[in-house]
Amino acid sequence: MIGSLAGAFAFGTVLPVPTGSTATLGRGVMTALPGVGIVLGAVAAAVLWAGSWAFGPHSALAGLLAVAVLLLATRGMHIDGLSDTVDGLGCYGAPERALRVMRDGSAGAFGAASIVVAVGAQTLAFSMLPGGWSGAVGVVVAVTAGRVAALVACRRGIPAAEGSALGGRVAGTQPAAVVLVWLAAVAALAIPATERIWQGPLTVVVAVGMTALLVRHCVRRFGGITGDVLGAAIEVTTTVVAVGLVIR
């Protein structure tokens, strides 16, 4: 378990985890990925708190700093995956052409727009979270829920897209029980994130459900999942949860 958690940090962050202490990327590492989300969320929550202290409550700059820390801590690979996935979904042609577009490396109009929307929405939503403990929990919930969505994308029965090295190693590795346990845990964690005790859990479940539909569409369009699809699942879910938690 320690090796899987270390592998999850090596895969999902810029932390210099010694390779000898990590498990090979696969089922165990992906199962531990939401644990990485808890730590990343706590770091982002601390930055949000410090920014709110420096710039005033509900400062958009504080929210932007929290998002920037997440991007730096993950090498921007998830937001890049979102951009590539949106570009792939936005092109015409066979799955092979869509996969070529995704592997091109440059961001098209759709991809660039998706980055702006995701970063902007997360920034504003984080800045609108209540101060104190509830707001910190909200950030942790949003970031962790994104990693739970990655497990949804890797659940049993989901294939890898042709030629996807990462997809081939993680697709279909997560039993439904693992996904449900993590989903229930994050939904429970979300209870104190809002004044209405049902809003947080409902937001988490709805966001993960929406991402499951996105993943299903990606499987139809691309023939399976890729690393980019995992990044898109993480960013979409994080954004939807963050926005859902600040609905009045």
From Swiss-Prot:
EC numbers: 2.7.8.26
User: Which EC class is the enzyme in?
Assistant: transferase
* Transmembrane parts of this sequence: 1-21, 35-55, 59-79, 101-121, 123-143, 171-191, 197-217, 227-247
List the catalytic activities from the record: alpha-ribazole + adenosylcob(III)inamide-GDP = adenosylcob(III)alamin + GMP + H(+); alpha-ribazole 5'-phosphate + adenosylcob(III)inamide-GDP = adenosylcob(III)alamin 5'-phosphate + GMP + H(+)
Per the record, the pathway is: Cofactor biosynthesis; adenosylcobalamin biosynthesis; adenosylcobalamin from cob(II)yrinate a,c-diamide: step 7/7
GO-annotated biological processes: cobalamin biosynthetic process
An MF annotation (GO) of this entry: cobalamin 5'-phosphate synthase activity
Q: Which Pfam families match?
A: CobS
Q: From the Swiss-Prot or TrEMBL record, state where the protein is found.
A: Cell membrane
Q: What is its main location?
A: membrane
Membrane topology, as annotated:
Multi-pass membrane protein
Listed GO CC annotations? plasma membrane
Q: Which family does it belong to?
A: Belongs to the CobS family.
Could you tell me what this protein does? Joins adenosylcobinamide-GDP and alpha-ribazole to generate adenosylcobalamin (Ado-cobalamin). Also synthesizes adenosylcobalamin 5'-phosphate from adenosylcobinamide-GDP and alpha-ribazole 5'-phosphate.
Protein's name according to its UniProt entry: Adenosylcobinamide-GDP ribazoletransferase
User: Whose protein is this, by species?
Assistant: Mycobacterium sp. (strain JLS)
Gene symbol?
Answer: cobS
